[in-house]
C-alpha cells in the first residue's frame, strides 16, 4: 500500500468520524428541543389577562368587498382612509367555513385595506353571554415571512454549502431554545439569570460544534464567546446599578407587573437577560473568526510563540473591533429612530432626554454589548495563544 493510499484511508476514516459526531450532536440537540417544546410550562402557574379568554385569531379569506368608501390619505397617498364592508370566509377556528360580514375601519393607526381573494387575520370574539363579534386584525403576513426565511436559507446554503446547512441547524437550535426554554422559563418564574446563562452556553456549544468538530479552535471560540458575553453582562450590571435601571424601567415593565405577581417572573433581571441574548451573536462572530484566523497562522508557521500569536490576534482584532462596534451601535440607533423623532416633536431638552429611562437603557445596552465584542479580542487572542501549541514538523 502506498503512502498516498494510506493518507486517503485516514482522511476517509476522519471524515466518517466527523459525520457520525455531527449526526449524534444533531440528534441530541433535537431531543433537547423536543423536550423543551413538550414540557407543560403551565403546570408551574399561568397568568391570563382579563377579557381575553374569549378572543381568538383565525385566518379568513375575503370572498367579496361589499362596499368600499376609502380615499387616499393626504399624509401618505399609498394608504387609504375610510370604511370597507367585507364578506369573509373563516378558514380556521370554531366557526370554520362560515361566512361573516365585517365592517373594516381604516384609520392612520389601524390601516388594513383588503381586496377580494386576500387572506387576513380575523379577531374572533366569542363571549358566553353575547353574539360573536368579528374585526379585521391585520394582514396575513405568515406566507411572505416564510418566503423571506426560505430565501435567506437558500442563500446561506448556496454560498455556504454543507457548512451553511449546519449554520442553519445551529440558528434553528438557538431560536428554539430561546422560544421554548428561556422565554417560558422566565415567564413562569424560574431563576432568569442562571437559566439564560446555562441555555446560552448550550446554544454556543451546539452552534460551534455544528460548524467545526471538537478541536482547539472550537474550544477557544467557545471559551472566548462565553467570556465575552459574561463581560458584556457584567458591564451592563455595573451600568444599570449606576443608572438605577431594572426591568421596571423598560417600556413594557409596567405591563409585566401583574404577570410577575402571579407567575414569579423576575423583573429585576430582564434588561440584563436582554443584553446577554443580544450580544451572543456578535461576540461569537468575533471569537470564531479570530480563532480561525489564528489557527491558520499557526498552521502556516508552526514555530510561532504564544506571545507572537497573541500579538497577531490583537492586530487582526483591531479591524474587527471597528466593524463590529459600528454594527452593534448602529443596530441600537436604528431601533431608536422613530422614538427620537417623536421626542424631537415633543420638544424634549437634552437634559430631559439623558435623564429618561429610554435613553439610559439604549446607551447602557448598546455600549455593554459593544464592549463585550471589544474585550472579546484580547480574550480570544489570549486563549488561542494558550491552547494552540507549536507544531512539530
Identify the function of each model-found stretch.
Residues 1-50:
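Hydrophobic secretory-pathway targeting helix
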Residues 319, 331-393:
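Hydrophobic alpha-helical transmembrane segments of membrane transport and translocation systems
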Residues 14, 188, 192, 313-328, ...:
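Loop-to-transmembrane-helix entry motif
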Residues 280-288, 294-340, 347:
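Helical hairpin unit composed of two closely spaced alpha helices linked by a short loop
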Residues 150-157, 162-258, 265-278:
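Transmembrane alpha-helical segments that form the functional core of multipass membrane systems
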Residues 106-143:
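Extended, hydrophilic extramembrane loops/domains of integral membrane proteins
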Residues 53-82:
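Structural detector for short beta-strands of small beta-barrel domains
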Residues 224-225, 229, 260-277, 323, ...:
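Pore-lining and gate-forming transmembrane alpha-helices of multi-pass membrane transport proteins
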Amino acid at each position: 500500500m502506498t503512502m498516498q493510499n494510506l493518507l486517503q484511508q485516514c482522511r476517509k476514516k476522519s471524515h466518517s468520524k466527523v459525520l457520525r459526531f455531527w449526526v449524534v450532536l444533531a440528534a441530541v440537540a433535537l431531543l433537547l428541543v423536543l423536550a423543551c417544546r413538550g414540557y407543560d410550562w403551565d403546570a408551574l402557574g399561568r397568568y391570563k389577562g382579563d377579557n381575553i379568554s374569549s378572543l381568538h385569531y383565525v385566518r379568513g379569506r375575503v370572498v367579496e368587498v361589499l362596499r368600499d368608501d376609502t380615499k387616499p390619505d393626504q399624509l401618505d397617498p399609498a394608504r387609504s382612509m375610510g370604511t370597507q364592508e367585507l364578506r369573509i370566509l373563516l378558514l380556521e377556528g370554531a366557526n370554520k367555513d362560515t361566512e361573516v360580514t365585517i365592517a373594516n375601519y381604516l384609520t392612520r393607526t389601524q390601516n388594513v385595506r383588503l381586496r377580494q381573494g386576500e387572506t387576513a387575520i380575523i379577531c374572533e370574539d366569542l363571549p358566553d353571554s353575547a353574539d360573536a363579534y368579528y374585526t379585521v386584525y391585520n394582514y396575513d403576513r405568515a406566507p411572505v415571512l416564510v418566503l423571506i426565511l426560505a430565501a435567506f436559507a437558500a442563500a446561506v446554503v448556496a454560498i455556504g454549502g454543507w457548512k451553511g446547512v449546519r449554520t442553519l441547524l445551529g440558528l434553528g437550535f438557538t431560536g428554539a431554545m430561546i422560544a421554548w426554554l428561556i422565554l417560558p422559563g422566565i415567564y413562569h418564574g424560574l431563576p432568569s439569570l442562571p437559566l439564560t446563562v446555562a441555555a446560552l452556553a448550550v446554544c454556543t456549544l451546539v452552534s460551534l460544534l455544528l460548524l467545526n468538530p471538537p478541536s482547539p479552535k472550537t474550544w477557544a471560540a467557545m471559551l472566548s464567546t462565553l467570556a465575552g458575553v459574561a463581560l458584556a453582562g457584567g458591564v451592563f450590571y455595573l451600568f444599570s446599578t449606576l443608572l438605577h435601571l431594572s426591568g421596571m424601567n423598560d417600556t413594557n415593565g409596567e405591563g409585566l407587573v401583574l404577570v410577575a405577581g402571579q407567575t414569579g417572573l423576575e423583573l429585576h433581571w430582564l434588561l440584563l437577560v436582554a443584553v446577554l441574548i443580544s450580544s451572543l451573536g456578535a461576540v461569537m462572530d468575533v471569537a470564531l473568526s479570530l480563532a480561525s484566523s489564528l489557527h491558520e497562522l499557526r498552521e502556516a508557521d508552526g514555530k510561532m510563540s504564544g506571545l507572537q500569536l497573541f500579538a497577531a490576534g490583537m492586530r487582526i482584532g483591531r479591524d474587527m473591533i471597528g466593524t463590529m462596534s459600528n454594527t452593534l451601535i448602529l443596530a441600537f440607533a436604528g431601533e431608536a429612530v422613530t422614538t427620537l423623532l417623536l421626542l424631537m416633536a415633543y420638544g424634549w431638552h437634552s437634559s430631559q432626554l439623558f435623564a429618561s429611562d429610554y435613553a439610559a437603557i439604549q446607551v447602557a445596552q448598546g455600549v455593554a454589548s459593544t464592549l463585550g465584542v471589544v474585550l472579546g479580542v484580547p480574550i480570544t487572542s489570549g486563549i488561542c495563544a494558550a491552547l494552540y501549541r507549536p507544531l512539530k514538523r
